[in-house]
């Protein structure tokens, strides 16, 4: 219960500070309201341009622009002017949710929820006597654009990959309503967590 309490307080604070992706706030609140379940880091899907010192050097990477809605060509062009050192990629990534459960039974149910909602990369594993379910889609796109501040692709090609990336982003997001429906069904089955009810009333005035 202590871990969920801390997770809820962190989520509520992030919501108040507008640090949670707007289109998944209600879904996150729904998931966290379920008994024996809470979320950690989650994202509604994003697209952007990232600069990496070398392949796989994620800790040192730098987003030149990152948005959770379709990106505009003009935004991408402007962001590319700030490239300095390293490999430049356009990346589009689907929604991802990290859901912790207190039982294997709940983990299996949420695993099935993810898969049946179209998130085909959904998996789960054991961490510190709890179960972590990663609800993840397949709509990943990574396109190299240049290196060390130089862009090697034409505007026409950049427009093309942005269009594809935006389509993939929205395809991933289109599965969110189905995911919400499934979690609503789970809540009806499992019940609402009194801790969520108490804390949300105090912190969010829901």
UniProtKB/Swiss-Prot annotation:
Protein name (record): tRNA(Phe) 7-((3-amino-3-carboxypropyl)-4-demethylwyosine(37)-N(4))-methyltransferase 2
Phylogenetic placement of the source organism: Archaea, Methanobacteriati, Methanobacteriota, Thermococci, Thermococcales
Reaction catalyzed: 4-demethyl-7-[(3S)-3-amino-3-carboxypropyl]wyosine(37) in tRNA(Phe) + S-adenosyl-L-methionine = 7-[(3S)-3-amino-3-carboxypropyl]wyosine(37) in tRNA(Phe) + S-adenosyl-L-homocysteine + H(+)
Enzyme Commission code: 2.1.1.282
Stated role: S-adenosyl-L-methionine-dependent methyltransferase that acts as a component of the wyosine derivatives biosynthesis pathway.
Family per similarity comment: Belongs to the TYW3 family.
GO molecular function list: tRNA methyltransferase activity
BP terms from Gene Ontology: tRNA methylation; wybutosine biosynthetic process
Keywords on record: Methyltransferase, S-adenosyl-L-methionine, Transferase, tRNA processing
Residues annotated as transmembrane: none
Enzyme class of the recorded protein, top EC level: transferase
Gene that specifies this protein: taw3-2
UniProt xrefs under InterPro entries: Taw3 (IPR022908), tRNA_yW-synthesising (IPR003827), tRNA_yW-synthesising-like_sf (IPR036602)
